[in-house]
């Protein structure tokens, strides 16, 4: 059939659109850290649980790669252009889409508190079964082949997601 495709393997999307009209609103219990952070800051949740502080990381908490949703959207556009322009090298390609840098749970909490001037109520609890120590993207191939890289900082992402959460609370 001569069908070409590209799969984007993204890591942890965070942030909100700059208009603050689009953001993450999980129904029920969130499955990601950032909604727990914002909902705790907004008073929707009493306390944020940090699962494990005994990992072999800089502060003992798990590490993940957090990518802004706008950077993620731009990666999709870059992949589509590659297909439209027929510059793909194989009929099926895949790319890691992330920042290439890991941030620990406590780094996320501390950065969120700092950039938004708010204190979070959190506690350290035991590890969750199945959680890995660290997961972050090697974006070397995506950077080169898609001519794409992230532009939005963790700080900007955490500011935007808090602005979005506050708008939901109004």
Region spans (language model):
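C-terminal substrate-binding subdomain of Rossmann-fold SDR/epimerase-dehydratase oxidoreductases
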Residues: 33-170
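Hydrophobic, Gly/Ser/Ala-rich alpha-helical and linker tracts in large acyl-processing enzymes
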Residues: 17-30, 37-40, 46
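Conserved beta-loop-beta element that borders a ligand/cofactor-binding pocket
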Residues: 1-19, 47-51, 89-90
